[in-house]
Amino acid sequence: MLTIADTTFSSHLIMGTGGATSHEALERALVASGTELTTVAMRRHAGTRGGESIFDLLRRLDIAPLPNTAGCRTAREAVLTARMAREALGTTWVKVEVIADEHTLLPDVVETLDATELLAAEGFTVLAYTSDDPVAAQRLEDAGAAAVMPLGAPIGTGLGILNPHNLELICSRASVPVLVDAGIGTASDAALAMELGCSGVLLASAVNRCQNPEAMATAMRHAVEAGRLARSAGRIPEREHAQASSTFEGLASWADQVL
């Protein structure tokens, strides 16, 4: 189970709606993923198909929407977007994403920290997108973030987990859920994130922009679960030298043979 604030989810996979080619493809992917929480960028408001908005789609699939402040460049913009989402959707949950520039799409940690502090004080449940800096993650937790979301790699790159050491360090120090966000390219990346100690994985492009979103969503669902189980099972320690899995005692020798 994944518990964020006072809400528990059975799935550790959070999906995003960005990059989906159609409502039909998105719906198939969401169902295949088993997700119960999905981000929606409020600035796009997702559009409609035959009168059905993405919010209608999520409601029909019984998936909770997670408003996202994607595209915001300042704490002020993020706070305003979160308040608009609260009014429009009746939710106090928000993924705070404040980017530094449109080329790297890397998070502006200073503005993110300010937005998190302001929104948490207003009673929002803040899931904060941040860098893979352990100090930044700790500052966001101290500011009231209900979950910290360090990137695996820049948004949309599909480069996977570029700094596994830092990600594992963030997980070991955090007392709130750590959800890796951005950079996931394929199922093995999602499994690794969970093996490093993450509580969950958020992804969008890896599924919505691949050749077969439904199949990849299925793969991601299994990968997240496999990584979580592997982490809880306790992997063997890494060794510099080989260690036989069977002893050499009782091996047959020429002395045992009848010539």
Swiss-Prot record:
Annotated InterPro entries: Aldolase_TIM, Thiazole_synthase_ThiG, ThiG
Keywords recorded for this protein, A-Z: Cytoplasm, Schiff base, Thiamine biosynthesis, Transferase
Cellular component, GO annotation: cytoplasm
Main function: Catalyzes the rearrangement of 1-deoxy-D-xylulose 5-phosphate (DXP) to produce the thiazole phosphate moiety of thiamine. Sulfur is provided by the thiocarboxylate moiety of the carrier protein ThiS. In vitro, sulfur can be provided by H(2)S.
Pathway named in the protein's UniProt entry: Cofactor biosynthesis; thiamine diphosphate biosynthesis
Main subcellular location of this protein, as a coarse class: cytoplasm
Assembly with partners or alone: Homotetramer. Forms heterodimers with either ThiH or ThiS.
Superkingdom assignment: Bacteria
EC assignment: 2.8.1.10
Residues binding 1-deoxy-D-xylulose 5-phosphate, per UniProt: 156, 182-183, 204-205
Active site: 95
Subcellular location: Cytoplasm
One function term, GO molecular function aspect: thiazole synthase activity
Protein's GO biological process: thiamine diphosphate biosynthetic process
Catalytic activity: [ThiS sulfur-carrier protein]-C-terminal-Gly-aminoethanethioate + 2-iminoacetate + 1-deoxy-D-xylulose 5-phosphate = [ThiS sulfur-carrier protein]-C-terminal Gly-Gly + 2-[(2R,5Z)-2-carboxy-4-methylthiazol-5(2H)-ylidene]ethyl phosphate + 2 H2O + H(+)
CDD domains associated with the record: ThiG
Pfam families referenced in this protein's UniProt entry, alphabetically: ThiG
Protein name: Thiazole synthase
Family: Belongs to the ThiG family.
